[in-house]
Amino acid sequence: MEYLSEPLCEAMLILEKEERERTCIVIDVGARSTSVAFVKGDGLSNLTSFSMGGSYITSDLSEACGISYNDARNLKKEIVLSLKGNDSDFYELVTLGGRVTKIPLNFANEVVCYRLELIAKTVNECIRLFAKEYVPYYPIYLCGAGVSKIKGGKDFFAKCIGRNISYGLPPIPAMDKPEYASMLGLLNE
């Protein structure tokens, strides 16, 4: 039996060998948890995970907007964080029951931004804790569906972290999306 570290497999897939020779940071925001991995060569120099991810955003939307979890999941697919509306702008959500519900655009965006700020704050704490010689130019790659499937999510997340972020994309045609990096990394090993 062989143990495969999911963050290491993910990093080995999305990062070129030359890129791994210098330290890189891979952040994977999944549904229920987030991992922050420092990648150096063919290994991880540090790894930490915490319980907060995209499903927390969905739960926040459900609770704040008074809608079901499934309806909140559908609303999250419509969110565009780069939009700043006025009081008359809404997301129109067709609920699973078939009725149309109007959710104020700015309110829904604020709910999502609040949780993304919490995730980013925790990621920054992880980076500070484990990077004794943290160099501000270490490239950061974002994987997982927790942030990447939210329109404008990566840019807002980068702003919260205070760094440029690139998507960690698997080099596989038709599967080159950050939400597939973890799964394909494990299959690749």
Show where each model-derived region lies.
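A polyampholytic, Gly/Pro-enriched intrinsically disordered region
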Residues: 22-29, 70-74, 182-189
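Gly/Thr-rich phosphate-binding beta-strand-loop-beta motif of the actin/hexokinase/Hsp70
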Residues: 18-47, 61
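Glycine-rich phosphate-binding loops at beta-strand->alpha-helix junctions
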Residues: 81-83, 135-159
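Phosphate/pyrophosphate-binding loops at sites that engage ATP/ADP/AMP, CoA/4′-phosphopantetheine
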Residues: 120-139
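Glycine-rich phosphate-binding loop plus the immediately following alpha-helix
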Residues: 1-3, 43-81
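Nucleotide/phosphate-binding catalytic cleft detector across ATP-hydrolyzing
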Residues: 1-25, 45, 68, 82-112, ...
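Glycine-rich phosphate-binding/hydrolytic loop that grips phosphoryl groups
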Residues: 9-14, 166-189
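Acidic-glycine-rich active-site phosphate/pyrophosphate-binding loop
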Residues: 29-32, 36, 151-167
